[in-house]
Amino acid sequence: MIISKTPVRVSFFGGGTDYPDYFKIYGGSVLSTTIDKYIYITVMKTNVFSDFKYRISYSRLETCKTLEEIEHPVVRAAIQHMNIPYGLEINIISDLPARTGIGSSSSFTVGLLHALYALTGKMVSKKQLAEEAIYIEQVLLQERVGVQDQLAAAYGSLNHMIFRENNLQVNPVIISKERKKLLESNLMMFYTGLSRYASVILEEQVKKTQDKTINTELKDIRDMVDEGLSILCDTDKDINQFGTLLHKGWMKKKTLSSAISNNFLDEIYEKAMNAGAIGGKLLGAGGGGFFVFFVPPQKQDEVRAALSDLNEVGFGFEDDGTRIIHIS
């Protein structure tokens, strides 16, 4: 039995510039961190006495006699991609709900590949895991996804990612533990109660990207990455500026697509801001999932009270990325 443990991520700035339609022409950039919320995947060879070849347990249970019968698209594509001839039992457990803007779909793809490679006795690099996850999602499954989530899941930590046509870079953000802890202590996360398929939200945005009608907005969003880095790396700068920039980024992001926000989500944001948040954003493509807010510690109880009808999720940063935590 193999167990992989793969983190999800919080993206601060640059989202939308990690789609090939944009970065292959203009270049993209993202500032993000992985957090201590994980997807756990166990894989093992099917017992020879079983009356099925594949058993996959997630929000539902699949038992299949052929690969083609598997309905979970990533599981089917990953097994096919790796050309694994024998049967498999796969169990998936997640700390947080799926389809909520934290990159969990790509964390799953990366974690599954990692576990399957370990089962076959192969050690693979973080770079290979990320690249193969991107290949599975973008090429084999033809999903409308970017590249930041796969890289975050594989590498882990607080990173500045740079995207070019033939080059995806992951650069660790070099700041002191104290500065990193200061950022972490000012962040709060709340679940809106809404989940959604990012591909549906992204249809309008991707079309606008292809039509080049949001180039100015995407350039502004990309430029915020450098601004965010400057705030983090210059200890003379007030960390609250990071929150102000988050607010600026969220206002800009909402112009990319009419599906990113709605009245319900706008009301949540307004409540948090009125209670003391300096800025925030809806994670991922938008339309639901998790809000992250930048809130000075002395104001956090007030924000908590204002959003008492939502579930708060406490979290911390993590530095490891995907890893194998059990082999037997």
Residue ranges and their predicted role:
Residues 1-13, 18-21, 30-32, 38-84, ...:
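C-terminal nucleotide
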Residues 23-25, 103-104, 144-145:
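Short glycine/proline-enriched turns and hinge-like loops at secondary-structure junctions
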Residues 67-69, 101-104:
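Short, solvent-exposed loop/turn segments at secondary-structure boundaries
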Residues 84-91:
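Conserved catalytic cysteine-centered active-site region
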Residues 94-100, 278:
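Short pre-catalytic strand/loop immediately N-terminal to key active-site residues, enriched for Gly-Thr
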Residues 102-126, 154:
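DPxDG-like acidic metal-binding loop motif
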Residues 288:
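Glycine-rich active-site/cofactor-binding loop and its immediate structural neighborhood
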